[in-house]
Swiss-Prot record:
Homotetramer. Interacts with proteins involved in DNA metabolism such as PriA, RecQ, RecG, RecS, DnaE, RarA, RecJ, RecO, SbcC, RecD2 (formerly YrrC), XseA and Ung. Interacts with RecQ via its 10 C-terminal residues. Interacts with RecD2. Phosphorylated by YwqD, which increases ssDNA affinity; dephosphorylated by YwqE. This is Single-stranded DNA-binding protein A. InterPro entries: NA-bd_OB-fold, Primosome_PriB/ssb, ssDNA-bd.
Length: 172
């Protein structure tokens, strides 16, 4: 039997982080996931799916994601129930997120307010935070930041100038 859920969507609000009495972190958030089809008026509808993640990942989700952030979730569907204050049985279905992927660069947050954690300076690294997170040495992160956070680091990008290549330089 298989119980596997894979979702890609945007957070509808900031994640809520709390701690159990045993000290385990738990974060809850809701993903808005577009349906693959449109309704009769041609508009795309969305499903709003509650997700839960635990421990270190819960803290990372709370620190780096916010309303509008694009995230990928891999987990399993779980149902639970409890009795509310009126004595009624309430059933809850949610995704237990085993893995949460941040699908946008830190400074490209979906809500337009500038990123996951503005104080974090790890260029392109979600959990780094240090000035030199590159395990191979060097300062590529600092060089990239000094270029005005340009996302177009492609040396072959068209900058409007003609390319002068002779036929002798081509390998074919």
């Amino acid at each position: 039997m298989l119980n596997r859920v894979v979702l890609v969507g945007r957070l509808t609000k900031d994640p809520e982080l709390r701690y159990t009495p045993n000290g385990a972190a738990v974060a809850t958030f809701t993903l808005a996931v577009n349906r693959t089809f449109t309704n009769q008026s041609g508009e795309r509808e969305a499903d709003f799916i509650n997700c839960v993640t635990w421990r270190r990942q819960a803290e990372n989700v709370a620190n780096f994601l916010k309303k509008g952030s694009l995230a990928g979730v891999d987990g399993r569907l779980q149902t639970r129930n409890y009795e509310n204050q009126q004595g009624q049985r309430v059933f809850v279905t949610e995704v237990q997120a085993e893995s949460v992927q941040f699908l946008e660069p830190k400074n490209g947050g979906g809500s337009g307010s500038g990123g996951y954690n503005e104080g974090n300076s790890g260029g392109g690294q979600y959990f780094g935070g240090g000035q030199n997170d590159n395990p191979f040495g060097g300062n590529q992160n600092n060089q990239r930041r000094n270029q005005g956070n340009s996302f177009n680091d492609d040396p072959f990008a068209n900058d409007g100038k003609p390319i002068d290549i002779s036929d002798d330089d081509l390998p074919f």
